[in-house]
Amino acid sequence: MPKIVATHEVEDVAHWLASPKRAEVFDGIATDIRTFVHPTEKNRVAVAFDVADMDKFEAVLKSEAGAAAMKYDGVRPETIVVYIEG
């Protein structure tokens, strides 16, 4: 099960941290979801996941539900960078 780390910018870090949407949209696809905030760049964050099925993970990112969750969370989609454990 690879670990995925995604970095991106958000509109409001406190809102993003408190949001239940991450867990809802990745339920059954990702486990051990952990959040991180950049210490000096106030809107840069990261999230780490353990993902069993990369195809399902990528499908969520491209889905309407994924887009709605990102919008709700204030994610700036154009800033997303995904890293896969090597």
How would you describe each model-predicted region?
Residues 1-86:
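Short S/T/G/P-rich N-terminal loop/turn motif that feeds into the first structured element of a domain
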